[in-house]
Amino acid sequence: MQRRIMGIETEFGVTCTFHGHRRLSPDEVARYLFRRVVSWGRSSNVFLRNGARLYLDVGSHPEYATAECDSLVQLVTHDRAGERVLEDLLVDAEQRLSDEGIGGDIYLFKNNTDSAGNSYGCHENYLIVRAGEFSRISDVLLPFLVTRQLICGAGKVLQTPKAATYCLSQRAEHIWEGVSSATTRSRPIINTRDEPHADAEKYRRLHVIVGDSNMAETTTMLKVGTAALVLEMIESGVAFRDFSLDNPIRAIREVSHDLTGRRPVRLAGGRQASALDIQREYHARAVEHLNTREPNEQVEQVVELWGRTLDAVESQDFSKVDTEIDWVIKRKLFQRYQDRYNMELSDPKIAQLDLAYHDIKRGRGVFDLLQRKGLAARVTTDEEIKAAVDQPPQTTRAKLRGDFITAAQEAGRDFTVDWVHLKLNDQAQRTVLCKDPFRSVDERVERLIASM
């Protein structure tokens, strides 16, 4: 499947402070954030004009699920548009607090852990064909996903009883199973709950919940692009060396704690391999696969950055990727800060900087400031992101949903939508079932819109 439907769901951390002290509970902050949403959507679970879903998840975490995308840059753009949607809610909520005489600064963090040790996720979705053994996909994918943090982790300062240490991944410490149907209790690497949001006879949806939330556009593109390419290779019958892990949960932590990528992890059958070895194998197969697939500039960029990042890890010369890979960008920032102020990694100011890197408010968030200075590379533009706040992807089913929502809202009609249904809540209760996520034109939807 060279053209694949993909999406990213991001849960955001939330807090509200007043002169540096916590002002409101996360529950209260979430209610203020979603008050505007509830006023027009009559719910804290809504679909937007750009085809995305916005809702309040378990534990008062705002969650944004992008619409269906079929290219990497399109997905990165719509993922960033989610930040803008949440930032608009933040600004509105702060104004409401001010109007009510409460005051306070609201923070939304695109990260994966809070100071209390709770974790919230960034879930990737990939449409895959129903035919074929799911177990083969998960067997080949697991070693790749366990070691993928080497190229696309968000970076984190981990406070241990002995000392503070810098790790590749925020999410690695919170994963407890390899493949499972749970998402919160056991937090697997791959979630097997079968909800295709498409024709279930043809497709299933691969739900990957191990990844970090990324700030750098290039890292997001690398994270999703490499996974999609590995899936494509599995579907094409590419043979990989067997890197089945003896204990994926121990391995994911060991990889996260080793910035050199060279520490051996134990494979099934007593063999050993390093994260670098494993990633090199997948990358080598990808380079070969490029020669057999249709040319695609975005996929070629992903394979090039993948190789360059592995070279940087192997040589420990990160200047090759220090504007493109989140954990490298963040580590360089910390090192400069430590050198300038002569402080240890365990200093509370570093922990504050770690959090501020993920603050999505423009002009305040540290990553945004780095990006403005040209210290973080880009794959999309502010103009494209702004357009994606209101406009759905034009090449997938998201266009049908977005056009329907826009038309219904402008006509003042009551409606209900989900990923596959578009329904007018009138006497006739007319409903269109859109089972093909690749289809952006549908006469039934056009007739439904025309009838308004």
Curated annotation (Swiss-Prot):
<dbReference type="GO" id="GO:0005524">
    <property type="term" value="F:ATP binding"/>
</dbReference>
<comment type="similarity">
    <text>Belongs to the Pup ligase/Pup deamidase family. Pup-conjugating enzyme subfamily.</text>
</comment>
<comment type="pathway">
    <text>Protein degradation; proteasomal Pup-dependent pathway.</text>
</comment>
<dbReference type="Pfam" id="PF03136">
    <property type="entry name" value="Pup_ligase"/>
</dbReference>
<dbReference type="GO" id="GO:0016879">
    <property type="term" value="F:ligase activity, forming carbon-nitrogen bonds"/>
</dbReference>
<keyword id="KW-0436">Ligase</keyword>
<dbReference type="InterPro" id="IPR004347">
    <property type="entry name" value="Pup_ligase/deamidase"/>
</dbReference>
<keyword id="KW-0833">Ubl conjugation pathway</keyword>
<protein>
    <recommendedName>
        <fullName>Pup--protein ligase</fullName>
        <ecNumber>6.3.1.19</ecNumber>
    </recommendedName>
</protein>
<feature type="binding site">
    <location>
        <position position="63"/>
    </location>
    <ligand>
        <name>Mg(2+)</name>
    </ligand>
</feature>
<dbReference type="GO" id="GO:0070490">
    <property type="term" value="P:protein pupylation"/>
</dbReference>
<comment type="function">
    <text>Catalyzes the covalent attachment of the prokaryotic ubiquitin-like protein modifier Pup to the proteasomal substrate proteins, thereby targeting them for proteasomal degradation. This tagging system is termed pupylation. The ligation reaction involves the side-chain carboxylate of the C-terminal glutamate of Pup and the side-chain amino group of a substrate lysine.</text>
</comment>
<keyword id="KW-0479">Metal-binding</keyword>
<keyword id="KW-0067">ATP-binding</keyword>
<feature type="active site" description="Proton acceptor">
    <location>
        <position position="57"/>
    </location>
</feature>
<dbReference type="InterPro" id="IPR022279">
    <property type="entry name" value="Pup_ligase"/>
</dbReference>
<feature type="binding site">
    <location>
        <position position="55"/>
    </location>
    <ligand>
        <name>Mg(2+)</name>
    </ligand>
</feature>
<feature type="binding site">
    <location>
        <position position="66"/>
    </location>
    <ligand>
        <name>ATP</name>
    </ligand>
</feature>
<feature type="binding site">
    <location>
        <position position="419"/>
    </location>
    <ligand>
        <name>ATP</name>
    </ligand>
</feature>
<feature type="binding site">
    <location>
        <position position="9"/>
    </location>
    <ligand>
        <name>Mg(2+)</name>
    </ligand>
</feature>
<comment type="pathway">
    <text>Protein modification; protein pupylation.</text>
</comment>
<keyword id="KW-0547">Nucleotide-binding</keyword>
<dbReference type="GO" id="GO:0010498">
    <property type="term" value="P:proteasomal protein catabolic process"/>
</dbReference>
<dbReference type="GO" id="GO:0000287">
    <property type="term" value="F:magnesium ion binding"/>
</dbReference>
<keyword id="KW-0460">Magnesium</keyword>
<feature type="binding site">
    <location>
        <position position="53"/>
    </location>
    <ligand>
        <name>ATP</name>
    </ligand>
</feature>
<dbReference type="GO" id="GO:0019941">
    <property type="term" value="P:modification-dependent protein catabolic process"/>
</dbReference>
<dbReference type="GO" id="GO:0019787">
    <property type="term" value="F:ubiquitin-like protein transferase activity"/>
</dbReference>
